[in-house]
Regions:
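Metal- and O2-centered redox machinery and metal/ROS homeostasis
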Residues: 1-228
Length: 228
């Protein structure tokens, strides 16, 4: 049995959370083109840990009757994030990064559901990957301009080299969701988890807001002293 309108249910069921995530101070500032390199590379670092956990767990569950269907290598982000981290931190980037506390909580949740109730990974997968695919090119343009980047350096995260038509791919992805062998109770649980995934993302963004504000304050104070 499959719930043929699952893709509609999860979209409608996460609308409020989606809107709330977009309205965190950090994301709102990012969308206005107000972002500094330090906060951005911290974001990339946290996303690296999140995607590493998600892709590792989903790969481990490739034979799972539900999770196996969302093991879509075209969407994988870890390799792209590694390129960006190398750009922002240099060749020894692995020794220079650590996850934030909110990121660690996010990663722990991914590991937990993978072990205890793997179908909930569908909610996490939907929350991150479909969002990346939907807004990737817009965010890429904003980041490129705000950070004054040349070419595509530092922007690999937004590149989906194996997906030439994002709109068509999203339609295919929604079709996969609609054909998963789930009952309504399971669908409801996945939607609840997707909303929790949005909260975990918001917690990460809110921690970045502190970094962003601190950097802005430092610039402001520096400019005052220069004027003196």
């Amino acid at each position: 049995m499959s719930v043929t309108d699952f893709s509609i249910q999860i979209k409608e069921g996460t609308k409020k959370s989606h809107s709330a995530a977009e309205n965190t101070s950090f994301v709102a500032s990012f969308l206005r083109g107000v972002v500094n390199k330090e906060s951005y590379r911290t974001l990339i670092t946290d996303l690296y840990y999140v995607y590493s956990a998600m892709e590792e767990e989903i790969d481990e569950l490739q034979d799972h009757p539900i999770v196996g269907h969302i093991n879509l290598s075209d969407l994988n982000r870890v390799e792209s994030l590694e390129k960006d981290l190398r750009y922002y931190y240099g060749p020894i980037w692995r020794s220079l990064i650590d996850p934030s506390e909110s990121c660690t909580q996010y990663v722990n949740r991914i590991r937990e559901v993978a072990k205890d109730n793997p179908i909930l990974l569908v909610g996490h997968h939907y929350t991150r990957y479909l969002g990346d695919l939907s807004g990737g090119q817009i965010l890429k343009g904003i980041a490129k301009k705000a950070l004054k980047l040349e070419g595509n350096h530092g922007l690999a995260f937004y590149e989906f080299d194996n997906i030439p038509d994002a709109k068509a791919y999203k339609a295919c992805y929604k079709g996969i969701l609609n054909h998963l062998d789930l009952d309504q109770k399971q669908v409801d649980a996945i939607i609840e988890e997707a909303n929790y995934a949005f909260k975990l993302n918001m917690d990460m963004f809110n921690s970045l807001e502190g970094n962003w504000f601190q950097s802005l304050l430092q610039i402001f104070i520096s400019s005052i002293f220069k004027k003196k």
